[in-house]
Amino acid sequence: MKAGHLLWALLLMHSLWSIPTDGAIRNYYLGIQDMQWNYAPKGRNVITNQTLNNDTVASSFLKSGKNRIGSSYKKTVYKEYSDGTYTEEIAKPAWLGFLGPLLQAEVGDVILIHLKNFASRPYTIHPHGVFYEKDSEGSLYPDGSSGYLKADDSVPPGGSHVYNWSIPESHAPTEADPACLTWIYHSHVDAPRDIATGLIGPLITCKRGTLDGNSPPQRKDVDHNFFLLFSVIDENLSWHLDDNIATYCSDPASVDKEDGAFQDSNRMHAINGFVFGNLPELSMCAQKHVAWHLFGMGNEIDVHTAFFHGQMLSIRGHHTDVANIFPATFVTAEMVPQKSGTWLISCEVNSHLRSGMQAFYKVDSCSMDPPVDQLTGKVRQYFIQAHEIQWDYGPIGYDGRTGKSLREPGSGPDKYFQKSSSRIGGTYWKVRYEAFQDETFQERVHQEEETHLGILGPVIRAEVGDTIQVVFYNRASQPFSIQPHGVFYEKNSEGTVYNDGTSHPKVAKSFEKVTYYWTVPPHAGPTAQDPACLTWMYFSAADPTRDTNSGLVGPLLVCKAGALGADGKQKGVDKEFFLLFTVFDENESWYNNANQAAGMLDSRLLSEDVEGFQDSNRMHAINGFLFSNLPRLDMCKGDTVAWHLLGLGTETDVHGVMFEGNTVQLQGMRKGAVMLFPHTFVTAIMQPDNPGIFEIYCQAGSHREEGMQAIYNVSQCSSHQDSPRQHYQASRVYYIMAEEIEWDYCPDRSWELEWHNTSEKDSYGHVFLSNKDGLLGSKYKKAVFREYTDGTFRIPRPRSGPEEHLGILGPLIRGEVGDILTVVFKNKASRPYSIHAHGVLESNTGGPQAAEPGEVLTYQWNIPERSGPGPSDSACVSWIYYSAVDPIKDMYSGLVGPLVICRNGILEPNGGRNDMDREFALLFLIFDENQSWYLKENIATYGPQESSHVNLKDATFLESNKMHAINGKLYANLRGLTVYQGERVAWYMLAMGQDTDIHTVHFHAESFLYQNGQSYRADVVDLFPGTFEVVEMVASNPGTWLMHCHVTDHVHAGMETIFTVLSHEEHFSTMTTITKEIGKAVILRDIGGDNVKMLGMNIPIKDVEILSSALIAICVLLLLIALALGGVVWYQHRQRKLRRNRRSILDDSFKLLSLKQ
């Protein structure tokens, strides 16, 4: 026996010993099957209890016809079977719909998926949240693997594959996470189309001891476990579209698959594949623990706010009654239902609500006595009236920021404020909630500090333990109501109309009064992790879409006991501001006809420009004001300011609320922007340290351009004592130049074409990358920030190694709290540019000075405490810098870069972090080249010879210039994302852009931690315009892996790249060293004679071979005995596990044998 043999025996023992012995092997037999699916099996709108003949909206989706498919579609789904014969299907709860079966495991477990494809095309199964190697990833893309490692990437019809997943500690729920984390699995050959076809299911990974030993296992810690997928399922993307047209359309030949109305009819706004309340009832017992596992999937329109009427949820330690869900977002919510009855779950995005994304859940008393709320506080009375008014969106008549008239032709605002025979102008009939002193409704309540509320109703305030009594008087011409968030109420005080088996006296008809009673028991108020007061909203829900667009919405504040003073205001806060960000769609208002009549519009002109007219009625407002017409928000330097921010509207109402000049804290995390979605509410705290006049605006480029701006003023007040001045020290200087270059978004198409196994013309990327048929291709002239070694700007700092991945981005600028960052900027471009940074304290309060072509300017950025990490943040936070001469056009031209600010002591002298081994900054942005300063030059350079023939408004041309990029690269053309196994990696994830820049970024094979007061586990990070996130990872899984945005259109458009985890070079050198040392121990000769020094003794050479063989034999024998004993222990332990697992591999093997005999 050679010495090396002993080494390999030792390594074998190590590998066997490393197999998890404390967890179960959980076998799942899944078959992929075609089936017929009905989105509305009850054949009606269950929410309103209307037939399809009486519901024009529901019938537009659900009635089949000459060129309409209707409610039934062929789909392909995962089904579970009892064993490898795939003959006995295991039933699942009806409410799971077309979702695959629940897969569940604990930390330490192994999941074996025995997948067989009974369908007509290749599919796979790819998981989130678990560990897998290359042969079990289930995702098709060029990753450098081959042979058996590719068998999992595409299981052909009739084929099968066994996927091996595990849940090691590196993928375990953290201490702060709930007992079980929500994940999904889905097919990943062409993931968007596979998922739209139906191949998706739920997966949970749990902490040890959470699951019992039953088959299937049940959770010990909850009484009910529900899984809900919120998705606009696009049947136009299904692999079965042609089959569905042929089967369900009465005249298939008449179908135009490109017709917009036909495509809309195939987009099913579903919960688990059911629409308009057709989801089978979700039943639970009051006062029992319920786990809700919520997840989303889909496209840019898949922005969902799930509202649970009547109950309160707990998500990551915070109380809420809504959950925000996006494509590949996973939410675990906990509930202990208190109020029995049939309650509504709905997506509160207006278009989704109207299109049927609603379901019921039923809370039964289950013989339990109803809980007695501990209400020891006040009864707070509010007298609120709905009053019709004429509302002016621009009362001062000019843009408060620029001073230009709102009606100046070509100014931008004139689109909304110029009155003509085809435009209403800026004044509309609306309805508003107004506060009165008592039930006589004679004397209004006037409070000077609430003048900024604008169209909003009065602020309703309460503390834990209080009862709120609202007397509502409807003096409007339509039935209206008041529906609250964030409080408890009985059925007779709910303001939403739906078919729950009760009457609805709480919708007030015209000139009718109704009274609502809401309560704030302890289990509904702010938690220990919440701020002192939580921001909520109330609104009319007789017809939620039309009521709120008409103006009926107001703020509600729920505080901890003792947080409100005698005057009803929050203690410890100097200023409170309530801001609603929404696009008021006056086309959806109850008063649309009245407004058109009042405007004396010409119907002929309207019919010629319907789209333009409707667009002019969509008012991008803050509290009902556009273009900085909101009454100015005044505060003093050093004040504690509470910003109560509210969102409302439809899927385009994705708002990144930016506070120019100062930063805010959100749950202890430092932010420059706060994200709002329909029916989401945020409390942000600011302590302004930067006097001046600043903007509040929505970061989504189009929203800001369309007027979603306001002004706040920070004054140096004599009554305020200055806080101790922060000490700064000059420390870091960057030399940055703006230069114009040719940029290629996709220099190599081989990855893209191999991925899709297609030609250039048939690839999804053709529209973006082809330079034929009037398109520009992948090359564009751009301006970029580049770093130089010194102020001569002669020697560029090379981009290699750690900075190779930056791509189009400028250099990664780093600083610590207390630093002064000096940026020497030279503009070598052909037009004026500047450098403006988020988060820092800029020395020039009027905004950064622009550098003319050839000019050199120096910018100074101070880094105060409020620019660095908050108490709940990671050690570093990410920001962004860009040219701000024209922020939108400058950024799309290419001038953008990352900025990182760290706590003191984190950065090394060379700028790197001492707590991380690698840092990567990634910008996910749809570069809209149509808005670049260089569009005309690019058309002339890269377009057709007759560039004057290019139609700049052509839809295909416009789409072709929208580059769905990661650091300016498409289809895995970004280079430099390489780490070694075991390294600590910080990812600075950045997003800017428009409301379509919703990016849910998924890391294959790795999970990461993100900070939100505590550490939480995830493998998808959500990004929106103006959000900058930091996630941290310990790279654990060697291989080349995919990273991509999970939004359907973004996947196909190329927003994906690969990152590589390499094994440590030390692994090989260590093994080599061990081998050499063993060899030395066996054959090392004594220098002076014919003996060998071995085991401390001089042994004659002639006896060495015999002794060596004997020693090795003894070692091997002892090793075998140890292995045998260990194997017996392991076998007994495993047998106990397997006896509790009826689907074990051994049992199934015997079943198969008996069937064959």
UniProtKB/Swiss-Prot annotation:
Biological role: Plasma membrane ferroxidase that mediates the extracellular conversion of ferrous/Fe(2+) iron into its ferric/Fe(3+) form. Couples ferroportin which specifically exports ferrous/Fe(2+) iron from cells to transferrin that only binds and shuttles extracellular ferric/Fe(3+) iron throughout the body. By helping iron transfer from cells to blood mainly contributes to dietary iron absorption by the intestinal epithelium and more generally regulates iron levels in the body.
The UniProt annotation places Na(+) 1 binding at 70, 73, 265
* Glycan attachment sites: 49, 54, 164, 236, 587, 713, 757, 930
What EC identifiers does the entry list?
1.16.3.1
The note on cofactor binding and number reads: Binds 6 Cu cations per monomer.
Gene of this entry? Heph
Question: Self-association or partners: how does it assemble?
Answer: Part of a complex composed of SLC40A1/ferroportin, TF/transferrin and HEPH/hephaestin that transfers iron from cells to transferrin.
In which residues is Cu(2+) 4 bound? Answer: 304, 347, 352
Q: Which family is this protein grouped under?
A: Belongs to the multicopper oxidase family.
**Which Cys-Cys disulfides exist here?**
180-206, 285-366, 533-559, 636-717, 876-902
Q: Which CDD domains match?
A: CuRO_1_ceruloplasmin, CuRO_2_ceruloplasmin, CuRO_3_ceruloplasmin, CuRO_5_ceruloplasmin
- Keyword Lipoprotein in the entry? The reply is no
Location, primary (coarse class): membrane
Q: What is this protein called?
A: Hephaestin
Q: Which residues bind Na(+) 3?
A: 768, 777
Membrane topology of this protein? Single-pass type I membrane protein
